């Protein structure tokens, strides 16, 4: 009798386990939409519709297609700025005033005051901060660069609802703490500056960073081809070879991942 009870219990637990396995479904990957707007400017749109502009250097960007220089084209929920150099801050202040989207950045009093940006449109951030913006989380990480006239350079890891993340490096050179960014956030997609010639992160240094510190599924080169003296796509292909993780985008092109 005791053996029958035990076997009945085993069968019941097995049936319960199978029933749960059939009803529980794994988290499905959701679409991440990425548009390269030229240089370091990107638009990310989550599956929930959160629209984020990063480093929106547009109207004076020679790499931005003419039809995308019109700021009325954009309706961001948030604007992320990695530092105050003109080719990254770009049109952020004007876009914030037009769209009422908050600028998320290390506080930069000079450009913000000059643009007469209302305080409620500024979301000060610092290295180590974790911000919930719509249905995404944004982690603020270090960058190795300068930030005249004020502030400090940072990068952003944008984490989506399905757990995947996009790392916009900003403008940086390779640095050892990239290992911590990989350890903490495991970026799946890296938007990597590769266009420096005399200074900054060259294609070779960028590739060393990818192979030494990161394990991405996708690497999208940026910060090249627009400004005088920057690397060309041919320069990049000579270094990156035929690595299938590298996705070359054209300014204005949109891809879904």
Language-model-derived ranges and their functions:
Residues 116-131, 208-257:
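Binuclear metal-ion centers of metallo-dependent hydrolases, dominated by the metallo-beta-lactamase
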Residues 60-62, 86-90, 110-113, 129-132, ...:
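Active-site environment of divalent metal-dependent phosphoester hydrolases
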Residues 67-131, 136-139:
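Active-site HxH/HxHxD metal-binding segment of metal-dependent hydrolases
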Residues 2-4, 11-51, 58, 242, ...:
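Zn-dependent metallo-beta-lactamase
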Residues 37, 46-85, 90-94, 146-148, ...:
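Pre-active-site segment of Zn-dependent metallo-hydrolases
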Residues 144-213:
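Active-site-proximal loop/helix segments of hydrolase catalytic cores
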Residues 54-56, 76-84, 103-107, 166-170, ...:
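Active-site neighborhood of phospho(di)ester-bond hydrolases with catalytic His/Asp-centered motifs
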Residues 26-32, 46-52, 130-139, 159-165, ...:
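Beta-strand-turn-beta hairpins that frame and shape the catalytic cleft
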């Amino acid at each position: 009798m005791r053996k029958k009870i035990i076997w009945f219990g085993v069968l019941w637990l097995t049936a319960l386990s199978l029933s749960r396995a059939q009803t529980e479904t794994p988290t499905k990957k959701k679409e991440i939409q990425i548009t390269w707007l030229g240089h370091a400017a990107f638009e990310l749109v989550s599956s929930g519709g959160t629209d984020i502009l990063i480093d929106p250097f547009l109207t004076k960007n020679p790499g931005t297609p003419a039809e995308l220089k019109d700021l009325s084209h954009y309706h961001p929920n948030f604007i992320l700025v990695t530092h105050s150099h003109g080719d990254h801050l770009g049109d952020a202040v004007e876009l914030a005033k037009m769209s009422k989207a908050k600028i998320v950045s290390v506080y930069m009093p000079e450009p913000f005051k000059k643009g007469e940006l209302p305080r409620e449109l500024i979301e000060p951030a610092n290295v180590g901060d974790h911000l919930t913006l719509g249905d995404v989380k944004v982690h603020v990480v270090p960058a190795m660069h300068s930030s005249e006239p004020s502030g400090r350079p940072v990068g952003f890891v944008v984490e989506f609802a399905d757990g995947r993340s996009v790392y916009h490096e900003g403008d940086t050179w390779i640095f050892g703490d990239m290992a911590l960014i990989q350890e903490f956030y495991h970026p799946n997609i890296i938007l990597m500056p590769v266009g420096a010639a005399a200074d900054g992160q060259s294609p070779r240094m960028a590739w060393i960073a990818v192979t030494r510190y990161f394990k991405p599924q996708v690497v999208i080169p940026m910060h090249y081809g627009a400004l005088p003296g920057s690397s060309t796509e041919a320069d990049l292909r000579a270094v990156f070879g035929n690595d299938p993780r590298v996705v070359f985008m054209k300014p204005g092109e949109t891809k879904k991942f």
